[in-house]
Amino acid sequence: MKIKEIKKVTLQPFTKWTGGKRQLLPVIRELIPKTYNRYFEPFVGGGALFFDLAPKDAVINDFNAELINCYQQIKDNPQELIEILKVHQEYNSKEYYLDLRSADRDERIDMMSEVQRAARILYMLRVNFNGLYRVNSKNQFNVPYGRYKNPKIVDEELISAISVYINNNQLEIKVGDFEKAIVDVRTGDFVYFDPPYIPLSETSAFTSYTHEGFSFADQVRLRDAFKRLSDTGAYVMLSNSSSALVEELYKDFNIHYVEATRTNGAKSSSRGKISEIIVTNYEK
């Protein structure tokens, strides 16, 4: 594939990811500071805003190691990743999916290379129920096979374009707790937090994007980090659910109410229009 062909590809998420921000991009764009220095996204997820902005100098992070490995392999081994995904596409079936899914139960996953692990996750997210990433308490992937007639498992042009973009810019890829991702934030930098949301009801479970979860204590710790970054002179933006708890946590900052469309969730009732909050430490 020629570089000039790659440049025509619009950068966008390479995988489905729960809580993705594609539907909210028009609103978020209106709230972004006009100019900023370095870009930080400590909960990058599928990277909808990251790819939309395509910053030249950025730090991206997530606490999901399997997801971050996908970013790393797209950067380092795009062609090998594409070839493995082509094999998954050729053999795609419910039986094939369930066999590959069980690799984290019978220790086969420990024998896989990093690029094989990335291809496994990307394949499963493309063909499973609603594109969910969900693991049980043993950190075993447990989402059933989806019912797609002709899923696009390999997007060769997009993977190649993302690889070129990451390699041609000053982009640092991290994995771990959000606080580790913001240690280098300085005055004039822009930080976007998109954490697992505070549930709107007692029956809403905290996310299982990783088997550790994200507690209310973590939400408070995040609010404290938001305040510290604000005090350093950084531009800070955060997304969360439209709830009284979020309003209370961020009462000292600017709160914007928006409507988002959710397209993936374990229950059909969790999809559709929902209210969200975007918090900024600056006026727009």
Swiss-Prot record:
S-adenosyl-L-methionine binds at W17, K21, G46, D62, D177, F178, D194. Keywords: DNA-binding, Methyltransferase, Restriction system, S-adenosyl-L-methionine, Transferase. It is an enzyme of class 2 (transferase). GO terms for biological process: DNA restriction-modification system; methylation; mismatch repair. Transmembrane segments: none annotated. It catalyses: a 2'-deoxyadenosine in DNA + S-adenosyl-L-methionine = an N(6)-methyl-2'-deoxyadenosine in DNA + S-adenosyl-L-homocysteine + H(+). It comes from the Bacteria. One of its GO terms (molecular function) is S-adenosyl-L-methionine binding. Its EC number is 2.1.1.72. Monomer. Homodimer. Belongs to the N(4)/N(6)-methyltransferase family. The DpnII restriction system has two different methylases. NCBIfam families: dam (TIGR00571). This is Type II methyltransferase M1.DpnII. It comes from Streptococcus pneumoniae. The lineage of its organism: Bacteria, Bacillati, Bacillota, Bacilli, Lactobacillales.
